[in-house]
Amino acid sequence: MSDNRRSRMITEGPQRSPNRAMLRAVGFGDNDFTKPIVGVANGHSTLTPCNAGLGALAARAEAAIRAAGGMPQIFGTITVSDGISMGTEGMKYSLVSREVIADSIETVVNAQRMDGILAVGGCDKNMPGALIAMARLDIPAIFVYGGTIKPGHYKGRDLTIVSVFEAVGEYSAGRIDEHELLEIERHACPGVGSCGGMYTANTMSSAIEALGLSLPGSSTMAAEDEEKAISAARSGEVLVEAIRANRTARQMLTRKSFENAIAVVMALGGSTNAVLHLLAIAYAANVPLTIDDFETIRQRVPVLCDLKPSGRYVATDLHRVGGVPQVMKMLLNAGLLHGDCMTITGQTIAEVLADVPDEPPADQDVIRPFHKPLYPQGHLAILRGNLAEEGCVAKITGIKQRSITGPARVFDAEEECLEAILSGKIKPGDVVVIRYEGPKGGPGMREMLAPTSAIIGAGLGDSVGLITDGRFSGGTYGLVVGHVAPEAAVGGTIALVEEGDSITIDADARLLQLNVSDEELARRRAAWQPRPPRYTRGVLAKYARLVSSASLGAVTDRFDGESA
C-alpha cells in the first residue's frame, strides 16, 4: 500500500491532470505526486504572545516533513487571545474558536485529501480544537505545542499574566498603588509563549502528551528555547513515519488513554477546562467518557506538582525537573497509568517512559514524592445537588475553606459582578452567583478570571464562594464552582436563585445545593420564562443554537436524540 492513501485521489491518473497543474504552481515536481501530502495547520498570529512564535515552528516542521519524504502544505487556522478578551464581550468568542479551529482543520484536510496533519498551536483553544479535528479525521496526526512563556520577575517574585489580574483587585482594594500596578503589568509577560502556570494551555499540552499525540517531554518546553524548535522538526519526522505505518489518531485516542490524560491533569493540578475539552475530544473520537469519570479518577490520583495558580512554580520549573514524563513515570509505577497505550512514536507509554527515573530529583520541590503529595486526591471535583443536576466542576486545591453556606449575591452577567466586587459590595461569607453565562446563555461560556482575580486581590479568596454556568480560566483558584449544568438559559435551577437565598458549596461532600424548599422551587420554575436570545445573527447566534450542555463537553455536532 502506498503512503499517499488519500491524496492519490487528487494526484493519480490522466483525469487528475488539472489538479496536478495547480499543485505544480505551489512547488510540486514530477517526482512529488506519489509522496504523502501532509497538512501543517499553522496557528501563527501576532494577536497574542501565545502564538507569536508559531510561524518559525511551522517552518521547522515543514522542512523536516519534506526531508523525510512528505510533501508539506501549510494552511492557517485562527486563534483568539483569552487573556486579552477576558472580562469583555470578546470572551464570548473564545470557546466558539475551539469549534472554528476544529471545523477549519477538518475542512481543509478532507477537502484536500491530505494524508496526515501536523497542527501547531499555542493559546488555550488551539489544543482542543486541533485534537477534535484529529479525532474526527482519524488519520496520522501530531500536535506541536508552541511552548510556554518564561516567567516575568518583579521585586524578587515570579510573575505570570494572572499576577496582573490579581493586581487589579489589589489596586481596587487600595492594597497597591497605580505605580505598583503598572510595574507588574510591565514585567509580567517578558516574551513569547503561552501563559506560564499550569493554566489551560499548559494543562492541555500536557494532556495531549499523555494521550500520545505529541512528542514525549515537549509539553513544558519554553517557547524561546532551541529545544522547542528541534522538537517541532522531530514532530514532522515522526508524523511521516506514522503515515508510512498508517498509525492514525484514534489508535492513540482510546478509553485508556483518556484515563491517562485525566490522571496526568489531576497530578499536575491542571485547569478545570480540561474537563470540558477532554469530553469534547472523546466525543469526536467516539470514546465513551462522562463527567463522572473525572470524579472516579480524582479520588485515586494525588496532586504531585506545586504549580501556579494555586501553587508556587511555573511550567518551565516543571520542565527543569523532568516535565510530564517524570510525573507519568510516577503514576505508572503507582499503577495509576495504562502503560500499554500507544503513542504517535510507535512506542507504548511504558516504552516511552522506560528510561525516565522512578523518582524526581531530590533537590527540588516542584514535583513532590508519591508518599508525600501536595494533596492526597485530585483537585477537580465533580459536584452535584439541586443546583447542578447534570454536575459541575469545582477546583478544590489552594483553598483553606472547603465549604461555605451563605447568602446568594446574584448577577446575570459577568460585568455586573465585577463592578460589585471592585466597589466593595461583596462581603465575607457571600456566595456570588454569575448566571446566563453558559454555552447557550452567554453565549460562549465566558471565563470568569476577572471576577475571581478581583476577589483574590481584594483579600476575599478564602471567605467568598462563587458559582457560575460559565467557565473559569486555568488561572483561577479559590472556592469556585463552574460549568453548572443545566445552565440558566435552558431553565436550570441556577436561573431560579434569588438574592439572599442560602447556598451551600461543600467540596468534601461534593455538594452544590440551593437551600430552598422543593415547593418554593416548583413555584419559581412555573413562573420562569426563557429569555430571548442575545444574538439573532452571526456566529454567536449559530453557536447558541447548536451547542450542547457543558456536562457533555459543549460540542456543536451532538444532535437531538443522540445519547450521551
Swiss-Prot record:
One family name in Pfam for this protein: ILVD_EDD_N
Stored InterPro entries: DHAD_IlvD/Edd, Dihydro-acid_dehy_C, DihydroxyA_deHydtase, DiOHA_6PGluconate_deHydtase_CS, ILV_EDD_C, ILV_EDD_N, IlvD/EDD_N
EC number: 4.2.1.9
Keyword field contains Magnesium: yes
Catalytic activity entry: (2R)-2,3-dihydroxy-3-methylbutanoate = 3-methyl-2-oxobutanoate + H2O; (2R,3R)-2,3-dihydroxy-3-methylpentanoate = (S)-3-methyl-2-oxopentanoate + H2O
Cofactor section: [2Fe-2S] cluster; Mg(2+)
Presence of keyword Amino-acid biosynthesis: yes
GO biological process: isoleucine biosynthetic process; L-valine biosynthetic process
HAMAP family linked to this entry: IlvD (MF_00012)
Protein name per the record: Dihydroxy-acid dehydratase
Species of origin: Chloroflexus aggregans (strain MD-66 / DSM 9485)
Gene name of the encoded protein: ilvD
